[in-house]
């Protein structure tokens, strides 16, 4: 019989219950309410999937912060600064994720970076030749037993040993973490044995790194690892799960040869591997087909998915085929049930996590009982696709004409950077090592209440404007008092750097409860790009104009770039992403023009998501980077030479895209570097990056206030790599999620660190 499965399920709860519980724990320190909430969310997830008839329900996919952090704890790979070897309690767990600063310790958090090309973030493991492993965290075993006690037989999920080591960071130059495989495997073998003893029959081992382009040496280490794992608990059936794309030929060959019972392949983003997989699958293996998109919110084309499933069953037999989501459903919102205000027609085109469970059930029934058993569902699905295809709301002829008429040679600024830099320095007269922030400032409950009051109609526009202007003035005066050189208005009016703009652009729609986990307690509510994009009126001009009127210091106009808006939205799937991005770029260009006309001399267009859009296969990079950089330049090319264009990027490795970053031709780029101790700057040095750079000198994802000496040390590291006249001083990222006291304290220390270095170099 053909079974259904999911690889993982949303963790935060339908109403962000996990976020509330985490923030309460971080404030009050009481463990019991947090653990009770976590248990409740796990149980609800298992029961919901069981009710929908999912055959293989995952366990250990839930986490309090991050599943890679859980694996760090499981294997005892705790860095020395967090009391490695001691019991891993909640305080240690969260210190690794967020840093810790109290009367007994002051430790920086571990690095965090993007999970492949998604907007989820994982904690980066740290490995050295001295790293040792031990089974230090039995969560995978405990949660299997917890589900079993509820009458739910689950398939435990582990981050695979190969991907765990590949995703880590070597703390010693030249060291390959894969060399630790021999030390790591006994921990996995122990876990598998204990899961078998607890009654597990299948275990899902995620190896998403197999989707990357790997060398023969890496693949050999993967094969050797699974030879050991398969022998550890012979009664267990291992399912190696890959996702986010097609496996390269050598990786697919390796996966098919692994001594495991099943292979999961993504058939949404990796449809090209379907035929090869069917022909190469050994007779002793099961093929899990990822037919339902786990990363986007559009309904599945049931006819196309069923055709793939039917052919697989015909070729392999029903007992050797499983129907699944392409990847974990943590990347989509929980359920459409709570979306009471979403347009009914648009809503009919969508499927969130719970609806995707229903799609899996329908597909499985169609395979098991034949097409006629789901003829009604197939007809309804086909009608929805036809209605969406022909809906006038998704097509805007004026937008399409404007994109069609773009001059491919007119996306550059008037003069080269060296000339612009001289013109801008004369205009602004900034000191060496100018200080600024990335854009957002802390948002209090009063700010959030003000936005809610306007939405509910409790406040009129005049009341709302008065409140926001007071917040902006407070932020401007604080920055002046601290001594920052370039100011921002603080963005109190913005819920999110993408949602805010989407609400003001045509072609976007919004959910009420469409929250998706970004990391830990951080959730985002991605807009839905359903149609052609245009800007009906200015979006930010009045707030920025007001902020600049309050001070003689330059204030940056703050925009989100077209690539980031694209990457952090649920994007229409009926046209190339590059086409949608060009539409957004033209809308942002109109805003740049209006900001400049309103007197803003500095405009920041943030592109933190530029790198995460890279295809996982390098052979596809050039095409993506060409249109992504073109879209950024298209959005800023109307700016005059005396207008300084800033951009910001975070969570990025820049070595392999440094040419593209230079091709953006932003006057100033600020980047997140504090957790990496300025190592990310090496790419800019090696490339001789010509423009100004603001390396982040403190980690805003942690509540700790860094000491002045700590930031000064980082600035000195930057000054060893770059000419001081091209260095800006700023935090790693925006400050929205921090509190006002810690923000002010950290910025005071940052400004003093910059002044101290200025004095030291005689600037």
Curated annotation (Swiss-Prot):
L-homocysteine binds at residues 438-440, 491, 606. Zn(2+) binds at residues 648, 650, 672, 733. It comes from the Bacteria. It catalyses: 5-methyltetrahydropteroyltri-L-glutamate + L-homocysteine = tetrahydropteroyltri-L-glutamate + L-methionine. One of its GO terms (molecular function) is zinc ion binding. Its EC number is 2.1.1.14. The keyword Transmembrane does not apply. The active site is at 701 (proton donor). InterPro entries: Cbl-indep_Met_Synth_N, Cobalamin-indep_Met_synthase, Met_Synth_C/arc, UROD/MetE-like_sf. Belongs to the vitamin-B12 independent methionine synthase family. This is 5-methyltetrahydropteroyltriglutamate--homocysteine methyltransferase. It comes from Parvibaculum lavamentivorans (strain DS-1 / DSM 13023 / NCIMB 13966). The lineage of its organism: Bacteria, Pseudomonadati, Pseudomonadota, Alphaproteobacteria, Hyphomicrobiales.
């Amino acid at each position: 019989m053909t079974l259904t499965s999911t690889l993982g399920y949303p963790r935060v709860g339908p109403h962000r219950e996990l976020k509330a519980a985490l923030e309460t724990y971080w404030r009050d320190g009481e463990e019991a309410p947090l653990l009770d909430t976590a248990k409740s969310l796990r149980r609800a997830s298992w029961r919901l999937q069981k009710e929908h008839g999912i055959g293989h329900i995952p366990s250990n996919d839930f986490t309090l912060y991050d599943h890679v952090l859980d694996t760090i704890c499981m294997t005892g790979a705790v860095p020395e600064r967090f009391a490695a070897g001691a019991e891993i309690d909640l305080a240690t767990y969260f210190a690794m994720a967020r840093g810790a600063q109290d009367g007994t310790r002051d430790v920086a958090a571990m690095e965090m970076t993007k999970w492949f090309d998604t907007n989820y973030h994982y904690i980066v493991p740290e490995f050295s030749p001295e790293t040792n492993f031990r089974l230090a965290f039995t969560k995978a075993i405990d949660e299997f037993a917890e589900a079993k006690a509820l009458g739910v037989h689950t398939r435990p999920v582990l981050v695979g040993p190969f991907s765990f080591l590949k995703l880590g960071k070597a703390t010693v130059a030249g060291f390959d973490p894969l060399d630790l495989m021999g030390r790591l495997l006994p921990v996995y073998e122990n876990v598998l044995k204990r899961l078998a003893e607890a009654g597990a029959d299948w275990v899902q081992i995620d190896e998403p790194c197999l989707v990357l382009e790997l060398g023969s040496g890496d693949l050999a280490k993967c094969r050797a690892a699974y030879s050991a794992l398969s022998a550890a608990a012979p009664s267990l059936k291992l399912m190696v799960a890959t996702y986010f794309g097609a496996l390269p030929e050598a990786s697919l060959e390796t996966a098919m040869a692994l001594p495991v019972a099943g292979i999961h392949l993504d058939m949404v983003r990796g449809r090209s591997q379907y035929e090869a997989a069917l022909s190469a699958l050994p007779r002793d293996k099961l093929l899990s087909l990822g037919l339902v998109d786990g990363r986007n919110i559009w309904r599945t084309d049931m006819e196309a998915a069923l055709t793939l499933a039917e052919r697989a069953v015909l070729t392999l037999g029903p007992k050797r085929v499983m129907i699944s989501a392409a990847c974990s459903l943590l990347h989509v919102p929980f359920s459409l049930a709570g979306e009471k205000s979403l347009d009914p027609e648009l809503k009919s085109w969508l499927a969130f996590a719970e609806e995707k469970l229903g799609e899996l059930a329908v597909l499985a029934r169609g395979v098991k009982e034949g097409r006629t058993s789901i003829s009604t569902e197939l007809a309804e699905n086909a009608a929805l696709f036809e209605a969406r295809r022909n809906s006038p709301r998704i097509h805007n002829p004026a937008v399409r004409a404007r994109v069609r008429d773009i001059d491919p040679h007119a996306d550059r600024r008037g003069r080269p950077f060296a000339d612009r830099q001289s013109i801008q320095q004369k205009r602004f007269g900034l000191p060496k090592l100018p200080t600024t922030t990335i854009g957002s400032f802390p948002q209090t409950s009063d700010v959030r209440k003000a936005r809610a009051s306007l939405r509910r109609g409790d406040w009129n526009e005049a009341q709302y404007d008065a409140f926001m202007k007071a917040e902006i003035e407070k932020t401007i005066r604080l920055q002046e008092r601290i001594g920052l050189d370039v100011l921002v208005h603080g963005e109190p009016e913005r819920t999110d750097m993408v949602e805010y703009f989407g609400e003001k652009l045509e072609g976007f729609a919004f959910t009420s409860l469409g929250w998706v986990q970004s990391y830990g307690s951080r959730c985002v509510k991605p807009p839905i790009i359903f149609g052609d994009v245009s800007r009906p009126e200015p979006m930010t001009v009045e707030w920025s104009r007001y902020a600049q009127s309050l001070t003689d210091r330059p204030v940056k106009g703050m925009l989100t770039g077209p690539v980031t808006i694209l990457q952090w939205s649920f994007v229409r799937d009926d046209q190339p992403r590059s086409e949608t991005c060009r539409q957004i770029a033209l809308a942002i260009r109109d805003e740049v023009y209006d900001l400049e006309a309103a007197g803003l001399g500095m405009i920041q267009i943030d592109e933190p998501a530029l790198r995460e859009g890279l295809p996982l296969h390098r052979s596809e990079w050039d095409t993506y980077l060409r249109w992504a950089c073109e879209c950024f330049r298209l959005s800023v090319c109307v700016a005059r030479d005396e207008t300084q264009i800033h951009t910001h990027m975070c969570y990025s490795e820049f070595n392999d895209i440094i040419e593209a970053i230079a091709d953006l031709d932003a006057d100033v780029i600020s980047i997140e570097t504090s957790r990496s101790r300025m190592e990310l700057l090496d790419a800019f040095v090696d490339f001789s990056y010509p423009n100004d750079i603001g390396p982040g000198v403190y980690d805003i994802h942690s509540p700790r206030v860094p000491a002045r000496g700590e930031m000064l040390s980082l600035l000195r590291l930057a000054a060893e790599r770059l000419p001081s006249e091209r260095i800006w001083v700023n935090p790693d990222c925006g400050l929205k999620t921090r509190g006002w006291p810690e923000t002010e304290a950290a910025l005071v220390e940052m400004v003093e660190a910059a002044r101290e270095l200025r004095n030291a170099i005689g600037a």
